[in-house]
């Protein structure tokens, strides 16, 4: 958000899995922010630059997490035992987060999904009870690309249906 630092996910070893890193846009040394076993993925800065939202499988299911931009205070934000939660996107006003879920058992928690029924959920950025806003068909490369309108009142997303051969 400051135009100077990038947050990204990288797989550096089989032992540690994928973690979240930051690096200056001018290059230099990357900084590893997460060290949990398994997949930490989908980092996104909050509009004020104070937090990075991401998804992690560190509790056994993929859930939404938030940390300070320096990697401290990694806090689980979703606690759904029946769904895996992915790809949090913070509203421009910083008040809401939208993310996707898919049901436990559809895939392994760390697998990227495609061609599944998924749900779009909305929750307060400060934490609290999420609410389901849509059930869609999609997955990786589609509704994980949801985007907030500048006024934080609407969300655009992609959904699709597979053509069936007749």
Predicted regions and their residues:
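Sequence signature of WD/YWTD-type beta-propeller architectures
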Residues: 1-166
């Amino acid at each position: 958000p400051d135009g100077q630092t990038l947050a990204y996910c990288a797989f550096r070893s089989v032992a540690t899995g994928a973690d979240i890193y930051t690096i200056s846009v001018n290059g230099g040394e990357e900084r590893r922010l997460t060290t949990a076993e398994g997949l930490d993925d989908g980092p996104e800065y909050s509009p004020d630059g104070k937090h990075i939202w991401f998804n992690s499988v560190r509790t056994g299911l993929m859930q939404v997490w938030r940390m300070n931009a320096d990697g401290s205070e990694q806090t689980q934000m979703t606690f759904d035992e029946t769904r895996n939660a992915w790809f949090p996107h913070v509203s421009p006003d910083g008040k809401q987060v939208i993310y996707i879920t898919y049901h436990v058992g559809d895939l392994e928690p760390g697998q990227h999904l495609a061609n599944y029924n998924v749900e779009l959920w909305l929750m307060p950025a400060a934490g609290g009870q999420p609410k389901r806003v849509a059930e869609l068909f999609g997955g990786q490369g589609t509704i994980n690309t949801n985007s907030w309108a500048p006024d934080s009142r609407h969300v655009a997303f992609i959904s699709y249906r597979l053509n069936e051969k007749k």
